[in-house]
């Protein structure tokens, strides 16, 4: 199992640059950025990195606000500018962002994502795309010379997981447990594509109290239909129930369970102070040994 890390809600681009350099010095396999509403652009951030792990990725880049031609152009530009190593993770996000904040109709995320990938993938591969569909009409070829990035897709529900297996190199998941990976995700995507799991952690000597606080902090996340359905499959009531809370041993044990469940890549996302993040990432040597 490959291990990488991400930085949750960085305050400044410099924080991302420093975190990626730290990940590289630690020998981690990957570093990931995320598109959060009103925050930094993940692809631009990756293009600014100096020292970095072998793989950098977006987990995820939102599809609805970006035309697939734009996404392909930006991704290939990052590949060319940085010497490769990009993994492009995309996904439809959620209605509260796409429709409520941006005013874009959140119509059939499954059909939209299928069509998006149908246009995006061949563009990344340097092909001329001629497509006329429900959401996009495209007749173009990109004059951008760069190796195609690996293509991942955010997926939790059964049909989205099956779509990821059909059209991408892997899935990106978050707010999941090892049991959800073993019983729901892995059986639907098989063993031929990657299963990338963002594992959110928190070092705490009072895990029950910490989980109660996180349940309040992440309450709105649990109301999003995709996450609510996924949590329901596992019999969980809150995204906080998926956070690994405890000491170093608890985190190492959780990583072992994710590996045994079929996870190919873990993206560690530590909560807490900078010192907590350092302690968490220091565990990688323990786990690897």
Go through each PLM region and give its residues.
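Active-site-adjacent structural elements that line small-molecule/cofactor binding pockets in enzymes
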Residues: 1-289
């Amino acid at each position: 199992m490959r291990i990488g890390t991400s930085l949750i809600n960085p305050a400044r681009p410099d924080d991302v640059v420093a975190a990626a350099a730290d990940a590289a010095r630690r020998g981690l396999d990957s570093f990931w950025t995320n598109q959060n509403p009103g925050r930094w652009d993940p692809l631009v951030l990756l293009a600014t990195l100096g020292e970095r792990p072998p793989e950098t990725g977006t987990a995820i880049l939102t599809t609805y606000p970006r035309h697939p031609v734009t996404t392909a152009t930006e991704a290939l530009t990052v590949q060319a500018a940085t010497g490769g190593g990009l993994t492009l993770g995309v996904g439809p996000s959620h209605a509260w962002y796409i429709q409520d904040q941006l005013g874009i109709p959140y119509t059939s995320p499954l059909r939209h994502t299928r069509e998006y990938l149908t246009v995006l993938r061949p563009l990344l591969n340097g092909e001329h795309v001629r497509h006329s569909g429900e959401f996009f009409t495209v007749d173009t070829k990109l004059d951008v010379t760069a190796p195609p990035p690996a293509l991942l897709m955010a997926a939790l529900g059964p049909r989205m997981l099956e779509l990821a297996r059909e059209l991408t190199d892997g899935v990106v998941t978050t707010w999941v447990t090892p049991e959800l990976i073993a019983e729901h995700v892995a059986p639907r995507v098989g063993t031929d594509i990657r299963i990338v799991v963002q594992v959110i952690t928190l070092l705490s000597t009072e895990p029950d109290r910490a989980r109660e606080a996180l349940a309040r902090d992440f309450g709105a996340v649990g109301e999003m239909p995709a996450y609510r359905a996924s949590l329901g499959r596992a019999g969980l009531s809150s995204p906080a129930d998926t956070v690994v809370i405890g000491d170093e041993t608890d985190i190492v044990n959780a990583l072992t369970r994710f590996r045994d469940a079929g996870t190919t890549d873990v993206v560690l996302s530590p909560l807490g102070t900078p010192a907590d993040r350092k302690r968490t990432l220091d565990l990688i040597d323990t786990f690897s040994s």
